């Protein structure tokens, strides 16, 4: 092969600042930080490969500390790494996890064999644009192409691999060779349905596209409830995790329901000491007949249901009256599950407090919306 992929991703550098050998090498080579130490190693590998008539290809982490002179970057943490490579005159291959990791579920998780997580339906693959419109023509030529990835920890057979690949690979192929202006998903979907049947006739095992369930119910349209747009405050030691903010302080009252994966920027994640402690200011005393929130569980990445949920109300924001306390036995399994923890009844209050804590397994808590409605029903 002309190219040798050397990886270079997810190098744990936590111990490098205190490692005597690392520090000695940094001093000898005049390197100012551990990122430059990794870059030094990548440069050495490239010199070796080039001397043997090969070219270096690596994940976008090889940008850290300075890119090797002739390296090609495979961008998996979004497209930003690829754009940085192109801007510096290097070739790039676009392979962002959001669009190109085919080990994610492609339909409702409870209808699919166990996967690593995530949700990447055919339509989302097709929506990928690997070349931003703002990129100049000379830089476009440096985008070498796109690549799908299928990691097989949860894929035990070739038949299962075929199901994960087809028909999503057909969508990525059209992404690669089509101008975005001529793409039409409805037209592609009709052709993909026919291609799936043709693949079956040839003995392949593609995903059953004609029976696709689609996104999680409620996730495609905003909902209305009493708390939409109200002010939300987070208790001490109970802030959301910055990497899973879902848009910030208003995320849990924005009327937007999360989909099948916590990575869709709609689920807010909590891993602080007290996990989740949220208070909603309804601005005035309000009749409330139900309060509820959905949580998800995906054991592989340590996302678990809460072990306890407390819903309480107040008129002064200081003294709260408990409406309901729910204890839940968290059980590990291989499924992606969704559970609503809610209260129904009659109450009048200005402030609504929703607390959720983790059990013995720890991990993240994820919820998408705290729904308050003024009639006796719960979502």
Roles of regions detected by a PLM:
Residues 1-69, 76-84:
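Active-site neighborhood of glycoside hydrolase catalytic domains
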Residues 6, 49, 73, 169, ...:
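Hydrophobic, well-ordered secondary-structure elements that form the walls
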Residues 16-18, 84-85, 104-105, 303-305, ...:
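Short, solvent-exposed loop/turn and secondary-structure capping segments
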Residues 20-29, 73, 108-111, 308, ...:
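Short secondary-structure boundary/capping segments
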Residues 55-61, 66-71, 76-222:
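Flexible, acidic glycine-rich loops studded with aromatic residues
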Residues 221-257:
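Predominantly extracellular/luminal regions of secreted and cell-surface proteins
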Residues 258-324, 335-377:
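Aromatic, loop-rich ligand-recognition surfaces of beta-strand-rich domains
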Residues 329-335:
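Short proline/glycine- and polar residue-rich coil/turn motifs
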